[in-house]
């Protein structure tokens, strides 16, 4: 499936982009925000990502001409389109999105209007890149079953109990942060 990369600090919009990607049925490619621009270029290109959600400050340090496979780049601050490949109509689509939503859902968008893509849990849903201490990062393909196994482990070992509080400093793009936060 299509791959969608996400890079930025932990925040609600990062989670929205991540969850929207996997519930759409695409493969999410989380990238650690402290990777240098050269590593980010490599990961986006190597993963064959077609969209990138990024913080504005990270985008300011990337070279769009090195990201030729991307169809578009979106800001994690407000989801506006920061860049689109020539010939794409994403900005035009976004300008009319509110009108389209009002026309399609005249009574408003409700919970029952949500329909998730049905995918087998053995399909790759996450392409997580290592820190690359011995060269460029390597992509690790994880399926729904891999992630469900982490949740099952946490439940069986009573990793957390009702009422527990957690202070996590790991980025959501980190393998552990992504699996357990």
Predicted segments, located by residue:
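Conserved structural elements of the adenylate-forming
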Residues: 121, 140-161, 166-169, 179
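Conserved S/T- and glycine-rich ATP-binding loop of Class I adenylate-forming
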Residues: 4, 21, 52, 124, ...
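Structural core segment of the AMP-binding/adenylate-forming
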Residues: 23-100
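Conserved AMP-binding/adenylate-forming
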Residues: 1-35
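Conserved pre-ATP/AMP-binding loop-to-beta segment of ANL
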Residues: 94-129, 136, 159-165
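Conserved AMP-binding
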Residues: 8-11, 32, 41, 170-174
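Conserved short alpha-helical elements in the N-terminal third of ANL/AMP-binding
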Residues: 19-24, 173-181
């Amino acid at each position: 499936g299509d791959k969608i990369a996400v890079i930025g600090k932990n925040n609600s919009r990062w989670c929205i982009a991540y969850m929207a990607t996997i519930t759409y049925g695409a493969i999410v490619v989380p990238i650690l925000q402290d990777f240098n621009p050269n590593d980010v270029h490599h990961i986006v290109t190597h993963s064959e990502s077609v969209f990138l959600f990024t913080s504005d400050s990270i985008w300011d340090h990337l070279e769009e001409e090195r990201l030729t496979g991307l169809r578009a780049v979106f800001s994690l601050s407000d989801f506006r389109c920061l860049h689109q490949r020539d010939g794409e109509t994403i900005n035009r689509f976004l300008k009319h999105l509110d009108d389209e939503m009002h026309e399609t859902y005249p009574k408003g968008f409700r919970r029952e209007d949500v329909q998730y893509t049905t995918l087998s849990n053995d399909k790759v849903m996450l392409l997580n890149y290592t820190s690359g201490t011995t060269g460029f990062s390597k992509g690790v393909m994880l399926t729904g079953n891999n992630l469900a196994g982490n949740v099952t482990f946490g439940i069986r070992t009573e990793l957390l109990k009702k009422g527990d509080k957690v202070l996590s400093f790991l980025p959501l793009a980190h393998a552990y942060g992504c699996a357990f936060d």
